[in-house]
Amino acid sequence: MTTVILIGVLGAIISAVVGTLWYSGATPMGKWHMQYLGFDKLSEEEKAQKIAEAKPRMWKNYSAQLLLSFITAFFIGFVTSYTVQNGGPASAVYYYVVMIWVAFTAPIIGQNILWGTSEDGLAWKRFVSDSASNLVTLLLIAFVATMMI
Protein backbone atom coordinates (compact mmCIF):
# COMPACT_ATOMS: atom_id res chain seq x y z
CA MET A 1 0.00 0.00 0.00
CA THR A 2 2.94 2.33 0.62
CA THR A 3 3.94 2.00 -3.03
CA VAL A 4 0.42 2.88 -4.16
CA ILE A 5 0.42 5.98 -1.93
CA LEU A 6 3.83 6.96 -3.31
CA ILE A 7 2.46 6.57 -6.85
CA GLY A 8 -0.37 8.89 -5.81
CA VAL A 9 2.07 11.53 -4.58
CA LEU A 10 4.32 11.23 -7.63
CA GLY A 11 1.27 11.30 -9.90
CA ALA A 12 0.07 14.55 -8.32
CA ILE A 13 3.50 16.06 -8.97
CA ILE A 14 3.52 14.73 -12.55
CA SER A 15 0.08 16.23 -13.11
CA ALA A 16 1.23 19.64 -11.85
CA VAL A 17 4.35 19.57 -14.03
CA VAL A 18 2.47 18.45 -17.16
CA GLY A 19 -0.21 21.10 -16.59
CA THR A 20 2.36 23.84 -16.06
CA LEU A 21 4.27 22.92 -19.21
CA TRP A 22 1.18 22.13 -21.31
CA TYR A 23 -0.58 25.42 -20.59
CA SER A 24 2.51 27.66 -20.58
CA GLY A 25 2.51 30.62 -22.94
CA ALA A 26 5.24 28.97 -25.00
CA THR A 27 2.94 26.23 -26.33
CA PRO A 28 0.01 26.42 -28.76
CA MET A 29 -2.16 24.88 -26.04
CA GLY A 30 -1.16 27.65 -23.64
CA LYS A 31 -2.07 30.29 -26.20
CA TRP A 32 -5.47 28.62 -26.77
CA HIS A 33 -5.96 28.46 -23.00
CA MET A 34 -5.35 32.20 -22.68
CA GLN A 35 -7.77 32.82 -25.57
CA TYR A 36 -10.65 30.92 -24.00
CA LEU A 37 -9.97 32.61 -20.68
CA GLY A 38 -10.19 35.94 -22.51
CA PHE A 39 -6.67 37.03 -21.54
CA ASP A 40 -5.69 37.65 -25.17
CA LYS A 41 -8.12 40.60 -25.27
CA LEU A 42 -6.85 42.25 -22.08
CA SER A 43 -4.22 44.94 -21.76
CA GLU A 44 -1.11 44.24 -19.70
CA GLU A 45 -2.56 46.26 -16.81
CA GLU A 46 -5.83 44.31 -16.92
CA LYS A 47 -3.91 41.01 -16.97
CA ALA A 48 -1.86 42.11 -13.97
CA GLN A 49 -5.05 43.12 -12.13
CA LYS A 50 -6.74 39.75 -12.85
CA ILE A 51 -3.64 37.88 -11.66
CA ALA A 52 -3.47 40.01 -8.50
CA GLU A 53 -7.17 39.30 -7.80
CA ALA A 54 -6.66 35.56 -8.26
CA LYS A 55 -3.48 35.24 -6.16
CA PRO A 56 -5.15 35.08 -2.71
CA ARG A 57 -7.19 32.00 -3.67
CA MET A 58 -4.61 30.27 -5.88
CA TRP A 59 -3.24 28.14 -3.04
CA LYS A 60 -6.75 26.71 -2.54
CA ASN A 61 -7.12 25.96 -6.24
CA TYR A 62 -3.70 24.33 -6.50
CA SER A 63 -4.27 22.36 -3.29
CA ALA A 64 -7.61 21.07 -4.56
CA GLN A 65 -6.06 20.16 -7.92
CA LEU A 66 -3.21 18.32 -6.21
CA LEU A 67 -5.72 16.35 -4.13
CA LEU A 68 -7.76 15.44 -7.22
CA SER A 69 -4.59 14.43 -9.07
CA PHE A 70 -3.48 12.35 -6.08
CA ILE A 71 -6.81 10.47 -6.13
CA THR A 72 -6.45 9.74 -9.85
CA ALA A 73 -2.84 8.58 -9.51
CA PHE A 74 -3.67 6.53 -6.41
CA PHE A 75 -6.37 4.74 -8.42
CA ILE A 76 -3.93 4.01 -11.25
CA GLY A 77 -1.40 2.68 -8.73
CA PHE A 78 -4.06 0.56 -7.03
CA VAL A 79 -5.30 -0.94 -10.30
CA THR A 80 -1.74 -1.69 -11.39
CA SER A 81 -0.94 -3.34 -8.06
CA TYR A 82 -4.18 -5.35 -8.06
CA THR A 83 -3.57 -6.50 -11.64
CA VAL A 84 -0.05 -7.71 -10.82
CA GLN A 85 -1.17 -9.43 -7.60
CA ASN A 86 -3.72 -11.39 -9.61
CA GLY A 87 -1.25 -12.58 -12.23
CA GLY A 88 -1.78 -9.92 -14.87
CA PRO A 89 0.96 -7.90 -16.48
CA ALA A 90 1.62 -4.43 -15.10
CA SER A 91 1.48 -3.14 -18.68
CA ALA A 92 -2.28 -3.85 -18.73
CA VAL A 93 -2.67 -0.53 -16.91
CA TYR A 94 -1.97 1.27 -20.21
CA TYR A 95 -5.09 -0.32 -21.70
CA TYR A 96 -7.10 0.55 -18.59
CA VAL A 97 -5.92 4.16 -18.65
CA VAL A 98 -6.77 4.65 -22.32
CA MET A 99 -10.20 3.06 -21.83
CA ILE A 100 -10.87 5.25 -18.77
CA TRP A 101 -9.87 8.26 -20.84
CA VAL A 102 -12.11 7.23 -23.77
CA ALA A 103 -15.10 6.28 -21.59
CA PHE A 104 -14.98 8.97 -18.92
CA THR A 105 -12.41 11.74 -19.25
CA ALA A 106 -12.89 12.75 -22.89
CA PRO A 107 -16.73 12.69 -22.70
CA ILE A 108 -16.76 14.75 -19.50
CA ILE A 109 -14.40 17.33 -21.00
CA GLY A 110 -16.56 17.36 -24.14
CA GLN A 111 -19.74 17.90 -22.12
CA ASN A 112 -18.17 20.76 -20.18
CA ILE A 113 -17.13 22.45 -23.42
CA LEU A 114 -20.41 21.71 -25.21
CA TRP A 115 -22.50 23.24 -22.43
CA GLY A 116 -19.91 25.82 -21.39
CA THR A 117 -19.04 29.21 -22.76
CA SER A 118 -16.29 28.41 -25.28
CA GLU A 119 -16.51 30.31 -28.53
CA ASP A 120 -17.18 28.08 -31.53
CA GLY A 121 -13.70 28.57 -32.98
CA LEU A 122 -12.05 27.62 -29.70
CA ALA A 123 -14.30 24.74 -28.65
CA TRP A 124 -12.52 22.05 -30.67
CA LYS A 125 -9.09 23.43 -29.79
CA ARG A 126 -10.03 23.40 -26.13
CA PHE A 127 -11.39 19.85 -26.35
CA VAL A 128 -8.27 18.55 -28.09
CA SER A 129 -5.93 20.41 -25.75
CA ASP A 130 -7.66 19.51 -22.48
CA SER A 131 -8.36 15.88 -23.34
CA ALA A 132 -4.85 15.32 -24.75
CA SER A 133 -3.33 16.88 -21.62
CA ASN A 134 -5.29 14.43 -19.50
CA LEU A 135 -4.27 11.47 -21.65
CA VAL A 136 -0.58 12.40 -21.50
CA THR A 137 -0.80 12.82 -17.72
CA LEU A 138 -2.59 9.49 -17.24
CA LEU A 139 -0.07 7.65 -19.42
CA LEU A 140 2.89 9.16 -17.55
CA ILE A 141 1.36 8.14 -14.22
CA ALA A 142 0.75 4.65 -15.63
CA PHE A 143 4.40 4.51 -16.69
CA VAL A 144 5.53 5.40 -13.15
CA ALA A 145 3.14 2.81 -11.72
CA THR A 146 4.50 0.05 -13.98
CA MET A 147 8.05 0.94 -12.98
CA MET A 148 7.25 0.88 -9.25
CA ILE A 149 4.95 -2.15 -8.96
What are these regions (language model features)?
Residues 1-149:
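Juxtamembrane/disordered regions of integral membrane proteins
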